[in-house]
From Swiss-Prot:
Domain of life of the organism encoding this protein: Bacteria
Substrates-to-products reaction catalysed: GTP + H2O = 7,8-dihydroneopterin 3'-triphosphate + formate + H(+)
Keywords associated with the record: GTP-binding, Hydrolase, Metal-binding, Nucleotide-binding, One-carbon metabolism, Zinc
Pathway(s) of this molecule: Cofactor biosynthesis; 7,8-dihydroneopterin triphosphate biosynthesis; 7,8-dihydroneopterin triphosphate from GTP: step 1/1
Protein name, as recorded: GTP cyclohydrolase 1
A biological process term (GO) from this entry: tetrahydrofolate biosynthetic process
GO MF: GTP binding; GTP cyclohydrolase I activity; zinc ion binding
Chain residues that bind Zn(2+): 90, 93, 163
Amino acid sequence: MTQLDSRTEATTTRAFDQPRAEAAVRELLLAIGEDPDRGGLRDTPARVARAYREIFAGLYTDPDAVLNTMFDEDHDELVLIKEIPLYSTCEHHLVSFHGVAHVGYIPGRDGRVTGLSKIARLVDLYAKRPQVQERLTSQIADALVKRLGPRGVIVVVEAEHLCMAMRGVRKPGAVTTTSAVRGQFKTDAASRAEALDLILRK
């Protein structure tokens, strides 16, 4: 088991600690010189904690439970879902990044496919964690390989990082593109080119 797999497996056994999160937000407000007891901030620790519980919900969901439905369609060509919206959180600054994911796969020899909504849910699961875009892209691809046994998988993620837009270099509109290719898409240039052409075609 790789280090990445170990981290992914470990997160599925945790539970969100609401009181601890509220206390941490209160301490942060004090650290920046605010009064957490004033009217506008009195309920902020609880609200932020609830928001974090939702934003990081992917830490508490088993990927295998998402890809739990298969259909025997005897399909042996590319299945591609484009422009899946995603919202995630940069683990370096805990600031959002957002964009779209394009996910494609060629079913294995058994021709089994999964529901289209399952692919979107898988993207959400890995996006709703403290992340870096490179790892997010690879995790989606590897989960599909593990669960579907496809002949090939391709994942492309395009996202704008607010840690680059609202602070630091302050370059709003800059888009980062990452890709992960597995199986036939990695070994066969023609298959990869076909998929990328469909992904990039608007």
